[in-house]
């Protein structure tokens, strides 16, 4: 029976154990009867509860029952005393009925108790309150009977409720903890898990129960000695009443079981944590080796262009993003495993290290595959980027070669050739870079089979290899075609350079010939002072003509070369319509002027030779000297020469040009006239010698 069940009855204080003891150390049970009618049933329940509190040892020392009848009637007292034989155990040794101050019929009362003495089994005495000290020490009596023992029924009841609650909770908790702890000690792991799972959490908090027990024990220990004036006053919460040793025993048992329970919880928590780690590890491993690896298996291509490679990179970044979430779980698990390893539980070290190694191997392998794939796609993107740049360079070079250029001069041709060479060199550099990128990509692809998870990647690799080699071969062919076209264009440009050079040199030949003509007309005007000088002038003139002839022939050859080059270049020669007529015109003018110069020099030679013969004194040939015809011939040649000096050179186009200036012609004519005068004088001397002598 628990106090909480009959709490309303206990609050009525129909009976109580004050904690006092008789001289035999037996407990004192007090029944305070009141004026109101006492319910025997409630009193019986109260007595049953109170008598269940003391230990068997206490009960063996017997009870002294004080029935306080001072405020009650005799019939009630009698009924209570008679009821004690059914409620109070046989160890009751004495019942003290405290009589009121009013007179009871002694004979009746004595007769009644004496009559029932044998049947009651205990002694019943009537005593006044002030006479109780004959049987019980004052310190063991409450203040109601003139004693010094302090008793607070409600305080006792509250403490009793606490005690019973603690006892009930601690007993139940001990059973639960024992079940849990015993279940955890079983050898069969399945039974252990089943028992722990079913009863792992106690119905009450062990910490709370322990705290309640300690507070209760502290209260019991403090209330044991609460007397005044240095005297000892026995508390109603004495250990014999509320079983202080029982509280201590319960606390000891609770501490022991709770310590075991905490260890079980720790082991359970560790096992749970280990199982959770193992489960998470397997989740990471299964995903990485399952869906994660499948994602990588499905991504083998490298794309056939920059856009395709970028699309594959974007897809790979999505795959990496999914992997990053699992790698984050890996980092967290690795930290948890490291913490457990540092805890130093030997029994779990092997399993933890195995899990850690398995997790690390899978994660590092998957991370390596992701990095390899990323590097492969980056290499493919760079390869396609170089290929695209090279293709654009080849397109630009091809476009430049396909346009038929018509440069204005050799300088522009040289500039065009330089630009072609630079573009071709840039193409060479780009092709070399493409080969390097392609070879690096091929090397990476060749290593792809090392992490193929058993998948045959021959087909995928062959497609990638064929694509890379195809791109490089295509670029090589395009570059070779451009080189061939550059060679053709270079030859054409060089021919055009030769054409421009020939045209330029031909124009220069015309200029030179014009300068020779100008020099002939302006400076080649002297006819010599005598035959010898004139012959020298004639010889120089012939050499001068040879120079002019060479210049003309050189110009003709250049113009013929331009015709051949134009035919080769399939273009119209600009020299044939301009330079060649100019060359021919100047040459004809030079020829006419040269012939005129030759005629004049030859006439001058004839004039000077004949004149010199006549003027020289040659007695051996008097007949010759006297030939009249010679004088006439000399005179005729002289006149013809003078006349010729006044006649301009008439070119084929009808234009006229004089040799030298009028003053130059006058000087030459004057010299001829002087010579003619000498010849005439000589003629006269030969005709009339006497005139010469007379004059002398």
Curated annotation (Swiss-Prot):
Pfam families for the chain: CRAL_TRIO_2, Spectrin_SESTD1
Domain CRAL-TRIO: 1-153
GO BP term, example: negative regulation of calcium ion transmembrane transport via high voltage-gated calcium channel
Gene Ontology molecular function, alphabetical: phosphatidic acid binding; phosphatidylinositol-3,4-bisphosphate binding; phosphatidylinositol-3,5-bisphosphate binding; phosphatidylinositol-3-phosphate binding; phosphatidylinositol-4,5-bisphosphate binding; phosphatidylinositol-4-phosphate binding; phosphatidylinositol-5-phosphate binding
Gene3D superfamilies: 1.20.58.60
Repeat region (Spectrin), residues: 275-378, 381-494, 500-602
Record function comment: May act as the primary docking protein directing membrane turnover and assembly of the transient receptor potential channels TRPC4 and TRPC5. Binds phospholipids such as phosphatidylinositol monophosphates, phosphatidylinositol diphosphates (PIP2s) and phosphatidic acid, but not less polar lipids including phosphatidylcholine, phosphatidylserine, and phosphatidylinositol. The binding to PIP2s is calcium dependent. Might be involved in the plasma membrane localization of CTNNB1.
Record's subunit section: Interacts (via the spectrin 1 repeat) with TRPC4 and TRPC5 (via CIRB domain). Interacts with CTNNB1.
Protein name (record): SEC14 domain and spectrin repeat-containing protein 1
Gene this chain is encoded by: Sestd1
């Amino acid at each position: 029976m628990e106090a909480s069940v009959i709490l309303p009855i206990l609050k009525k204080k129909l009976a109580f154990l004050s904690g006092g003891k008789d001289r035999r150390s037996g407990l004192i049970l007090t029944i305070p009867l009141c004026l109101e009618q006492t319910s025997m049933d409630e009193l019986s329940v109260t007595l049953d509860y109170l008598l269940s509190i003391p230990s068997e040892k206490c009960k063996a020392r017997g009870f002294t029952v004080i029935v306080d009848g001072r405020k009650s009637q005799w019939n009630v007292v009698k009924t209570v005393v008679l009821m004690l034989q059914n409620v109070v155990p046989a160890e009751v040794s004495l019942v003290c009925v405290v009589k009121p101050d009013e007179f009871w019929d002694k004979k009746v009362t004595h007769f009644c108790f004496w009559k029932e003495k044998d049947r009651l089994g205990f002694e019943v005495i009537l005593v006044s309150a002030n006479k109780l000290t004959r049987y019980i020490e004052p310190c063991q009596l409450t203040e109601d009977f003139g004693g010094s023992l302090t008793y607070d029924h409600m305080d006792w009841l509250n403490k009793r409720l606490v005690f019973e609650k603690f006892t009930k909770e601690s007993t139940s908790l001990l059973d639960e903890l024992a079940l849990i702890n015993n279940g955890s000690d079983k050898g069969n792991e399945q039974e252990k898990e089943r028992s722990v799972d079913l009863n792992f959490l106690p119905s009450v908090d062990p910490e709370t129960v322990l705290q309640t027990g300690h507070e209760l024990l502290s209260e019991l220990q403090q209330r044991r000695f609460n007397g005044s004036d240095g005297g000892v006053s026995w508390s109603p919460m004495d250990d014999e009443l509320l079983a202080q040793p029982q509280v201590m025993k319960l606390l000891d048992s609770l501490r022991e079981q709770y310590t075991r329970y905490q260890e079980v919880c720790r082991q359970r928590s560790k096992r749970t944590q280990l199982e959770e780690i193992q489960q998470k590890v397997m989740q990471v491993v299964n995903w990485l080796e399952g869906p994660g690896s499948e994602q990588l298996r499905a991504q083998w291509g490298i794309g056939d262009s920059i856009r395709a490679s970028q699309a594959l990179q974007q897809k790979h970044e999505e795959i990496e993003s999914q992997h990053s979430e699992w790698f984050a779980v890996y980092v967290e698990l690795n930290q948890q495993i490291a913490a457990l390893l540092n805890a130093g539980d030997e029994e779990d070290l092997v399993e933890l290290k195995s899990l850690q190694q398995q997790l690390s191997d899978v994660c590092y392998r998957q991370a390596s595959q992701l990095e390899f794939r990323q590097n492969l796609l980056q290499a493919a993107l760079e390869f396609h980027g170089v290929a695209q740049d090279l293709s654009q360079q080849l397109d630009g070079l091809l476009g430049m070669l396909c346009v038929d250029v018509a440069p204005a001069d050799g300088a522009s041709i040289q500039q065009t050739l330089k630009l072609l060479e630079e573009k071709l060199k840039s193409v060479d550099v780009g092709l070399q870079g493409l080969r390097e990128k392609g070879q690096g990509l091929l090397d990476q692809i060749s290593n792809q089979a090392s992490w193929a998870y058993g998948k045959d990647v021959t087909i995928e690799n062959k497609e990638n290899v064929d694509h890379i080699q195809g791109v490089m071969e295509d670029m090589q062919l395009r570059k070779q075609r451009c080189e061939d076209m550059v060679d053709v264009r270079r030859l054409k440009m060089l021919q055009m350079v030769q054409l421009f050079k020939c045209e330029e040199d031909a124009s220069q030949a015309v200029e030179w010939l014009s300068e020779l003509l100008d020099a002939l007309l302006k400076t080649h005007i002297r006819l010599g002072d005598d035959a010898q000088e004139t012959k020298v002038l004639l010889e120089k003139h012939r050499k001068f003509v040879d120079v002019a002839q060479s210049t003309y022939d050189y110009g003709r050859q250049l113009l013929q070369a331009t015709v051949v080059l134009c035919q080769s270049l399939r273009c119209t020669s600009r020299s044939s319509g301009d330079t060649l007529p100019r060359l021919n015109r100047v040459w004809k003018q030079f020829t006419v002027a040269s012939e005129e110069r030759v005629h004049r020099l030859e006439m001058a030679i004839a004039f000077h030779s004949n004149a010199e013969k006549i003027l020289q004194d040659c007695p051996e040939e008097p007949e010759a000297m006297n030939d009249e015809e010679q004088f006439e011939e000399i005179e005729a040649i002289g006149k013809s020469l003078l006349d010729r000096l006044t006649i301009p050179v008439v070119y084929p186009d009808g234009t006229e040009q004089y040799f030298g200036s009028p003053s130059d012609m006058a000087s030459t004519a004057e010299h001829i006239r002087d010579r003619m005068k000498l010849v005439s004088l000589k003629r006269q001397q030969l005709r009339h010698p006497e005139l010469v002598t007379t004059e002398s």
